[in-house]
Every structure is written in structure tokens, then in C-alpha cells.
Amino acid sequence: MKHNIIELAQNLIRRPSVSPDDQGCQQMIAQRLEKLGFTIEWMPFNNTLNLWAKHGCGAPVIAFAGHTDVVPTGDKSQWVYPPFEAEIVDDMLYGRGAADMKGSLAAMVVAAEEYVKANPNHAGTIAFLITSDEEAAAKDGTVRVVETLMARGEKIDFCMVGEPSSSKTLGDIVKNGRRGSVTGNLYIEGVLGHVAYPHLAENPVHKALPFLQELTAYQWDNGNEFFPPTSLQIANIQAGTGSNNVIPGELYVQFNLRYCTEVTDEFIKNTVAEMLKKHGLAYRIEWNLSGKPFLTEPGKLVDAVVDSLESVAGVKPKLDTGGGTSDGRFIALMGAEVVELGPLNATIHKVDERVSVTDLVTLGAVYNQMLVNLLD
């Protein structure tokens, strides 16, 4: 298994697939899966390539989900090991995407290969949902594939997302949910004027201060067993012309909430609207919902993954819902149990991104054992 995982990971890393350009990564994976008897379906949307591959039939449907796109490298001269050469030094595989998440993809593919070779007539269905649009807009990737599958009445029962979930050691963290994310783009109206004649103008910054104080101090909820309390942060504020003698005519405030399952996005929107009305502000607001929160409570999938980590890696993981959003939020809409397990995340999106070769091999064995636990 070791040689296959590392070789595939290196071949994927050597393709500079900066989002949403797949650079042939999915074709490489599809060719391997097709040799095993997987049915291959391409789902291109605009400039994004997506792959839906299946082996077997019936329930349960176990999907491996991941992305071939990577974030830009930044200044390549800052890299000790070039970002697309996939060098191995002292058990570390270097390159953009090594941890996020071409290493996981390689481990998933080889784990499935090993399982299908040993169990060609396995129960249920093993599937792959792979996109090249996770790191950027996330508009034409997993979300579009999920919409297509749901429209056809297809179902995913269990989904393993290979995002780099681990913190200090491989498998110490398993993500069994994620907070929702909603952004408000708020424009508060004023009246432009000269700072020496404030009675002839209306300063939207001054008017908005009491509202902003209430907004930032508001306690949305207390969280629960699986989620921390909902958090609001102001991300951007802009007003004025840049001149020191002009009262601004408009104030722009952008804020984001990472919210738990105790509240809904509708509750958040209604609460903000009530605050704005209370403070008598003239405004317009545009909302952008990046994703609703989801939670996979301990059950078949969580138990299978925890058991796999304990038996293969000797690690008892902590279940966690922290961090940003992932494509798991879209797959959860299908009613699937979703967890995320992947390599250490300490170097993702950084210069000299890297992953332990030993960890990738272990990860492949864990994914394989998960299939055994769910299908045998």
C-alpha cells in the first residue's frame, strides 16, 4: 500500500491544479478507478470539473469526498522545496496540496483499490465525489453534484471527507460536524456634507455606533454538547471619501457569524433586522449564506471511524466541530452521516506545505478498515 499511496500523491502534487483548474488530476484518479470496475460519470459545471464514480450497488452507499484544487503558492522563492515537485525529505512529502488534500485523495483511492481487490463482490456501494472547486468559489463543485444526485433520487448514507482534520498527531481530531457561516453586507445611509456644518448632514457612522455596540455584544446562544456558542465578528468597515472635511454619506459594515445548531440563519437575519429597526437606521443589507451547520452524532459512521483509528493507529480521537466550513456541509444536505479525517493541518496553505509519508500510509489503512467495518 505504501508505494502506491505515495506515488499517487506525488503524481497529483506535480500537477499545479490551482482552483478551479484540475490539471488532469481527476482523470488520473478516474483511470485507476475504472480499471477496478468503477462506473465513471463526469459532471462539469462552467469551468469546474467534478467526478462521480461508483462500484457495487445498493445500500449502504459509502462516499469518499475530496478536492483536487489547491490554493496559490504565493512567492515560490520562499519555498525551500518547490511547491510542485513533490520532494520527500526525512519522511516528509513536500508540495502544495500535500496535506490539503492530495495526500488524503491518494490514501482514499488506494484504500478503495485494496478493499475492492479483496472483496470484488462487496455489499453496498463505494463511491467517490471529487471536485476542483473547493478552495475558491465553491459554487460549481460539490454543491452542484449534490443537487444533481438529489434530483435523480440518489442517496449517500456515509461520507468520509479527507480534509486535514488532525492537529498534533494523525487521527487525534475527527470532525463530526461544522458550524454554519453567514455574512451580512450592511449599508447604512447618511447624508453627505461638510464637517463644519454637521447640522446640514447626517453622519451614518455616529448613527450606527449604538447598533454596532449591541450587535457585537449580543449573545446568540450558549452552544451545546457538540458546538461552541455562535460567534459574530466584524470583518470590514468602510466610510468616507478619504478627506478629513467630508461627513460620509454611507457606512459599509461587513460581519460574519459562525453559528451552531442552536440557531438558524433565518433567526439571525430577523434578529439583525429587529436591531436595525430599533435604532431607527435607514439601511440595506445583503446576506450570503455559505453553509448551514451540520452534525453527525455518534452512530454507525462515527463508531466505524473511531474503531478504525484505535485498531490501526492506536489513537482515540476527539470529536470536534471547530474550524471553517468544508464541502461536508453540502453532502450533509442529502441526509448522509458525514465525518472528516485527514492529515495534520499545521502547514496547510503555507509555504513548504508537507505531510508525513508514514501518516499517509497509516491513513490509507484507516480508510480501508473503515470500509471493512461498514461493509463486512
UniProtKB/Swiss-Prot annotation:
PROSITE patterns: ARGE_DAPE_CPG2_1 (PS00758). Binds 2 Zn(2+) or Co(2+) ions per subunit. Its cofactor is Zn(2+); Co(2+). One of its GO terms (molecular function) is succinyl-diaminopimelate desuccinylase activity. Keywords: Amino-acid biosynthesis, Cobalt, Diaminopimelate biosynthesis, Hydrolase, Lysine biosynthesis, Metal-binding, Zinc. The active site is at residues 69, 134. It is an enzyme of class 3 (hydrolase). Gene3D superfamilies: 3.30.70.360, Zn peptidases. Zn(2+) 2 binds at residues 100, 135, 349. It catalyses: N-succinyl-(2S,6S)-2,6-diaminopimelate + H2O = (2S,6S)-2,6-diaminopimelate + succinate. Its EC number is 3.5.1.18. Pathway: Amino-acid biosynthesis; L-lysine biosynthesis via DAP pathway; LL-2,6-diaminopimelate from (S)-tetrahydrodipicolinate (succinylase route): step 3/3. One of its GO terms (biological process) is diaminopimelate biosynthetic process. It comes from the Bacteria. Zn(2+) 1 binds at residues 67, 100, 163. Belongs to the peptidase M20A family. DapE subfamily. Catalyzes the hydrolysis of N-succinyl-L,L-diaminopimelic acid (SDAP), forming succinate and LL-2,6-diaminopimelate (DAP), an intermediate involved in the bacterial biosynthesis of lysine and meso-diaminopimelic acid, an essential component of bacterial cell walls. Homodimer. This is Succinyl-diaminopimelate desuccinylase.
